[in-house]
Amino acid sequence: MDPVVVLLLSLFFLLFLSLWRPSSGRGKLPPGPTPLPIIGNFFQVDMKDIRQSLTNFSKTYGPVYTLYVGSQPTVVLHGYEALKEALVDHGEEFSGRGRLPICEKVAKGQGIAFSHGNVWKATRHFTVKTLRNLGMGKGTIEDKVQEEAKWLVKELKKTNGSPCDPQFIMGCAPGNVICSIILQNRFDYEDKDFLNLIEKVNEAVKIISSPGIQVFNIFPILLDYCPGNHNIYFKNHTWLKSYLLEKIKEHEESLDVSNPRDFIDYFLIERNQENANQWMNYTLEHLAIMVTDLFFAGIETVSSTMRFALLLLMKYPHVTAKVQEEIDHVIGRHRSPCMQDRSHMPYTNAMVHEVQRYIDIGPNGLLHEVTCDTKFRNYFIPKGTAVLTSLTSVLHDSKEFPNPEMFDPGHFLDENGNFKKSDYFIPFSAGKRMCLGESLARMELFLFLTTILQNFKLKSLVDPKDINTTPICSSLSSVPPTFQMRFIPL
């Protein structure tokens, strides 16, 4: 056959496939832009601004629509009503974890974030129970955060008001809180292993949040054959896993079953009990991945939020002035802030909430997956279909938060200046897969930020109006730009 004819027939077949598949292949899936064979909607999504692309699609196809990631459909939920209906009202059906190949390659179905089914339920139950035993939601954890806040102040005072990059210091504070829960002890801010841990977590989050890395998630076959930052991500994970397995071994050698010291001890004790959960994976590798998940969630999320907060507080000095006035009035300068203060500090509480709303730290959270064939609204979503939840569409809803692109603590204040809660405040997602450490993160942000503002004047090296708060990447997590500043003791 003539090569030209073959080429034309091939092109016709591909065109036919692309037009036919959405109508017959999708069945009752929600509507969406027409995908191309093999690559899906890849070229229709701006990888540098996925949030805006999702918003644009919602204007055409509504709050529930379908995008094709490669050849696989992904249902997108846009807006508060769609997310609430799926994650809360149909929580069990939408409680699966979607596939993220670059993360799955290291997690291997283990840990908290990327396990599935009964193993995930057992792992989550153990984690929640153990964190409560270790003081989560109680004064025990608050004491740890307050103590770390004092160390944070000491470390910032060492800068003597000179220009500094706050990235590592802001990572060390929440990092030590997590270490005290998992490994019993905190670390000195100059400890080499500790700094290495913080650095590798920071670097890993930047890598998996970069636009380029999403190509490997869409076409995972490339992971084993192409060079790229994903290899650094794998290397960092290998180091962290080895470090944690070494710590676990030390715990085994010094374990006292009658006196558990930390998260690792509780795991080691339970794995040897006769009535242990049959669905729980009690291997040490599973424990190492669990702890890795806690490090990633507990360090970088809080660290990035605090760095964004510092940028915003310098950019909007009138907000900082109001917060410091409230600190002087309620707390003063001679005692440490505590969580009881929060109810008497509506503006400070509003500021902390507004920082989280404005920066949108996890624009789409982690992918969900339906655990069974699911009827949702007028659509049919087959078991195993990935579900993307646009948290941005809720946190930046213009009806709930007028002028959502403006940083304004007034979004969380009523007409009398009292703190105003909002159901649309879901930076930690919602439903069965929401972040386990939400209460700890909120506590850390309030106590760390109020302690910093109680003790320091924040000084930018550039004019406030020139401060850039745009994330350097935001595919998975919003990462703040690198900057320097001065902490001037008050």
Swiss-Prot record:
<comment type="similarity">
    <text>Belongs to the cytochrome P450 family.</text>
</comment>
<dbReference type="GO" id="GO:0005506">
    <property type="term" value="F:iron ion binding"/>
</dbReference>
<dbReference type="Pfam" id="PF00067">
    <property type="entry name" value="p450"/>
</dbReference>
<keyword id="KW-0472">Membrane</keyword>
<comment type="function">
    <text>Cytochromes P450 are a group of heme-thiolate monooxygenases. In liver microsomes, this enzyme is involved in an NADPH-dependent electron transport pathway. It oxidizes a variety of structurally unrelated compounds, including steroids, fatty acids, and xenobiotics.</text>
</comment>
<keyword id="KW-0492">Microsome</keyword>
<protein>
    <recommendedName>
        <fullName>Cytochrome P450 2C13, male-specific</fullName>
        <ecNumber>1.14.14.1</ecNumber>
    </recommendedName>
</protein>
<feature type="binding site" description="axial binding residue">
    <location>
        <position position="435"/>
    </location>
    <ligand>
        <name>heme</name>
    </ligand>
</feature>
<dbReference type="GO" id="GO:0004497">
    <property type="term" value="F:monooxygenase activity"/>
</dbReference>
<dbReference type="InterPro" id="IPR001128">
    <property type="entry name" value="Cyt_P450"/>
</dbReference>
<dbReference type="GO" id="GO:0006805">
    <property type="term" value="P:xenobiotic metabolic process"/>
</dbReference>
<dbReference type="GO" id="GO:0043231">
    <property type="term" value="C:intracellular membrane-bounded organelle"/>
</dbReference>
<keyword id="KW-0560">Oxidoreductase</keyword>
<keyword id="KW-0349">Heme</keyword>
<keyword id="KW-0256">Endoplasmic reticulum</keyword>
<keyword id="KW-0408">Iron</keyword>
<dbReference type="GO" id="GO:0005737">
    <property type="term" value="C:cytoplasm"/>
</dbReference>
<keyword id="KW-0479">Metal-binding</keyword>
<dbReference type="InterPro" id="IPR036396">
    <property type="entry name" value="Cyt_P450_sf"/>
</dbReference>
<dbReference type="InterPro" id="IPR050182">
    <property type="entry name" value="Cytochrome_P450_fam2"/>
</dbReference>
<dbReference type="GO" id="GO:0020037">
    <property type="term" value="F:heme binding"/>
</dbReference>
<keyword id="KW-0503">Monooxygenase</keyword>
<dbReference type="GO" id="GO:0005789">
    <property type="term" value="C:endoplasmic reticulum membrane"/>
</dbReference>
<dbReference type="InterPro" id="IPR002401">
    <property type="entry name" value="Cyt_P450_E_grp-I"/>
</dbReference>
<dbReference type="InterPro" id="IPR017972">
    <property type="entry name" value="Cyt_P450_CS"/>
</dbReference>
<dbReference type="GO" id="GO:0006082">
    <property type="term" value="P:organic acid metabolic process"/>
</dbReference>
<dbReference type="GO" id="GO:0016712">
    <property type="term" value="F:oxidoreductase activity, acting on paired donors, with incorporation or reduction of molecular oxygen, reduced flavin or flavoprotein as one donor, and incorporation of one atom of oxygen"/>
</dbReference>
